């Protein structure tokens, strides 16, 4: 797939800009806070309908504007599509494909696929478990857009169940037994939690099982085979096999075991929203004992594995978005990354200095100077 054009209106600090991409590699160069990351964020939204920087659309709209717009012309192997996201400071966003409005987000997801790698991704290793869950969920959404719908339903069920548990907590703490109506309501939400949670965890397990060997292979290449990376899925509800009935039963049993704790805390403590993903180098947990260099190598291996897996599943190479990541990698890891990319993936890269790239890369790339939300195509000799 190839992103041919991108149009931004009242998006972040862009008043109105359009760019036509003319090479497999585009380098966005400029000082900090000029809009380089904002452009990559727009592409990320087209791919996932989410931003890793905010969950509020009003923060995406230019100050003083009521709404903003992202439009793109995408060339795929057998089709061409015009994608459009209308963002509103207040109210729901509108999604269009070829000027036809999408009734569901599910219809829009999967049109464009992209993998983003930024300095924030180091939190994949050293951050809290929700960082790793969000990373895995974003990947699974691109592999199977239906997953976003299932996850959204699961999160809604957890929210409603939490509200019920919170209302029952005071009654439980006074020593009163739950009434028949309360017990029936909780049982109803239990069934929905188990049903949707089972669909989520089985997809997570299968997705990670496909990604893990790819990550291990890439890690071996980058590290020179000095360490072995093991990626493990550590679900809150454990089971053996892939039979949904087995997962169902394990889920119900753990809910029964944790009933008192849930009533005491007034919140749901069982389910995939408590899952973890583990990264182990040889026999050592990377999160607690890995050096900064080891952690960067691990994240780089994960990102290259994502690219490989998405390409295998969808049959086309996804876009690669590199947000100021070269500054976080030493020269050896930079070389490994740039060699892996070559011209196989359309790549958008942000940087403050072109000197981080060798001459061959600069000569073959489209270079855009970014200044205060304005784009200008430049030659390498005109910068740095």
Swiss-Prot record:
Main subcellular localisation: cytoplasm
Keyword match Nucleotide-binding: yes
Residues annotated as binding ATP: 30-37
InterPro entries: DNA-binding_RecF, DNA-binding_RecF_CS, P-loop_NTPase, RecF/RecN/SMC_N, RecF_2
Protein keywords: ATP-binding, Cytoplasm, DNA replication, DNA-binding, Nucleotide-binding
A molecular function GO annotation: ATP binding
GO biological process terms on file: DNA replication; DNA synthesis involved in DNA repair; double-strand break repair; SOS response
SUPFAM superfamilies, per database record: P-loop containing nucleoside triphosphate hydrolases (SSF52540)
Job of this protein: The RecF protein is involved in DNA metabolism; it is required for DNA replication. RecF binds preferentially to single-stranded, linear DNA. It also seems to bind ATP.
Family: Belongs to the RecF family.
Protein name: DNA replication and repair protein RecF
Naturally occurring in which organism (per UniProt): Synechocystis sp. (strain ATCC 27184 / PCC 6803 / Kazusa)
Gene transcribed to yield this protein: recF
């Amino acid at each position: 797939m190839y992103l041919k054009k991108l149009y931004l209106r009242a998006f972040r600090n862009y008043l109105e800009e359009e760019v036509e991409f003319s090479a497999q590699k585009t380098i966005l160069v400029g000082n900090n806070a000029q809009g380089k990351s904002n452009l990559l964020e727009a592409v990320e939204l087209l791919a996932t309908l989410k931003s890793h920087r905010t969950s509020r659309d009003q923060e995406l709209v230019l100050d003083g504007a009521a709404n903003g717009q992202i439009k793109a012309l995408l060339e795929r192997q057998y089709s061409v599509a015009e994608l459009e996201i209308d963002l509103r400071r207040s109210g729901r966003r509108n999604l269009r494909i070829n000027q036809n409005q999408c009734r569901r987000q599910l219809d829009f997801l999967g049109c464009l696929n992209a993998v983003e790698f930024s300095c924030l991704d180091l939190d994949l290793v050293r951050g809290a478990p929700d960082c790793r869950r969000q990373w895995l969920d974003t990947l699974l959404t691109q592999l199977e857009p239906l997953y976003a719908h299932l996850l959204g339903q699961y999160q809604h069920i957890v929210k409603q169940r939490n509200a019920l548990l919170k209302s029952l907590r005071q009654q439980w703490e006074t020593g009163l037994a739950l009434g028949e109506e309360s017990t029936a309501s909780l049982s109803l939400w239990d069934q929905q939690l188990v049903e949707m949670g089972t669909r989520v965890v089985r997809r997570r397990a299968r997705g990670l099982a496909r990604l893990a060997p790819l990550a291990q292979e890439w890690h071996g290449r980058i590290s020179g085979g000095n360490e072995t990376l093991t990626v493990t899925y550590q679900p809150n509800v454990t089971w053996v096999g892939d039979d949904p009935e087995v997962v169902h039963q394990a889920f119900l049993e753990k809910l029964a075991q944790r009933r008192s704790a849930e009533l005491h805390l007034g919140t749901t403590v069982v389910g995939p929203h408590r899952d973890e993903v583990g990264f182990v180098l040889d026999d050592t947990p990377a999160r607690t004992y890995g050096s900064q260099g080891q952690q960067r190598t691990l994240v780089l291996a994960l990102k290259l594995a994502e690219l490989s897996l998405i390409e295998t599943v969808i049959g086309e190479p996804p876009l690669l978005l590199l947000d100021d990541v070269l500054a976080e990698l030493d020269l050896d890891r930079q070389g490994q990354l740039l060699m892996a990319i070559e011209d196989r993936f359309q790549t958008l890269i942000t940087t403050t200095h072109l000197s981080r790239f060798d001459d061959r890369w600069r000569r073959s790339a489209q270079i855009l100077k970014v200044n205060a939300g304005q784009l200008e195509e430049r030659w390498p000799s005109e910068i740095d």
